[in-house]
Amino acid sequence: MNLNAPFSPQPPLAAEHLPLTLMRLDDWLPINVSGPDAQSYLQGQLTADLPSLAATQHTLCGHCDAQGKLWSSLRLLRRRDGFTYLLRRSVATLQMLELKKYAVFAKASIVSDEGAVLLGVAGAQASEALGALFPRLPDADAPLLQAGRSHLLYMAWPQPRYLLICDDADEAERIFAPLSARARLADSAQWLALDIESGIPLIDEPNCDSFLPQAVNLQALGGISFTKGCYSGQEMVARAKYRGANRRALFWLRGSAERLPHASEDLELRLGDSWRRSGTVLAAQRLADGGVYLQAVLSSDLPADSVLRVRDDARSQLTLSPLPYSTDQQE
């Protein structure tokens, strides 16, 4: 069966209303890094501390330029004989080009895994449905599990959900066939909406090379090591922590809008009877009920009762929603 055919676009649902849902995550791409120098090379490029990454863990992290600005946020794990990271497909070509710049001096191969299939499973009874296909599932204590030709990643927010990296289409079909009989089918938009609810930073091409990792909450999410030593952009990232150079943070907004803003657009903040341009949109989704979810980078000291709107949209109203984690800047 052609796995693309059933995954037709449809408006996303909020996590609290989501039935068992199977998604094909074509808007994300896995990149494999292998070779004798894979770990040491990535250690000098990414914000995470790779030697401390256990085989049962996955982590968010960032890849920065020399000024500490993010080429992309990544989800990193050990896979096969090296590492795999997941990122938004729109930024993959540019990010890989930057990552490969100095790889000529290392025994490390960096290739996109176009043969792999990424699936998402979320919603009511997601654990029970996957448990019928796998003898064990990842959980909060060990959120990464290899099961044959699949790697299963557990994510707790906004409700327990799973991302599956299937080695090939045959493995994806093995999972798809039984699940599709009982699950709602959706495309990447549903997973993106869940990431917005979760406060997981979504860096697409228009926002590439724009933000320090702290500005998209990577420090609050445990995605930055300040003890690992040098990596690309490390000095500027450390300065943002120790000198308070960063005054921005990632927020989840929801409300109404006549139109969806594009990534990199600014919003408008209500100040009395007037509006002032503020912040940068990272991602936006319109839900099935007509409401809007936005992820945006705004001033970190923005009052919790602030009201914003989509630029030049007089009928729009957006308010801040709490994230499922503390935004205190911890390592």
Curated annotation (Swiss-Prot):
InterPro entries for this protein: GcvT/YgfZ_C (IPR029043), tRNA-modifying_YgfZ (IPR023758), YgfZ/GcvT (IPR045179), YgfZ/GcvT_CS (IPR017703), YgfZ_barrel (IPR048451)
**GO function terms (MF aspect):** folic acid binding
Residues at which folate binds: 28, 191
Q: Superkingdom of the source?
A: Bacteria
Supply the alphabetized keyword list. Cytoplasm, Folate-binding, tRNA processing
Any single Pfam family the record assigns to this protein: YgfZ_barrel
Transmembrane regions listed in the UniProt entry:
none
**Localisation:** Cytoplasm
Q: Which terms under GO biological process does the entry name?
A: iron-sulfur cluster assembly; RNA modification; tRNA processing
| Primary location group | cytoplasm
GO cellular component entries: cytoplasm
Q: State the function annotated in the UniProt record.
A: Folate-binding protein involved in regulating the level of ATP-DnaA and in the modification of some tRNAs. It is probably a key factor in regulatory networks that act via tRNA modification, such as initiation of chromosomal replication.
Q: Which HAMAP family does the record cross-reference, listed alphabetically?
A: tRNA_modifying_YgfZ (MF_01175)
| PANTHER family xref list | TRANSFERASE CAF17, MITOCHONDRIAL-RELATED
Which family does the UniProt entry place this protein in? Answer: Belongs to the tRNA-modifying YgfZ family.
Q: Provide the protein name.
A: tRNA-modifying protein YgfZ
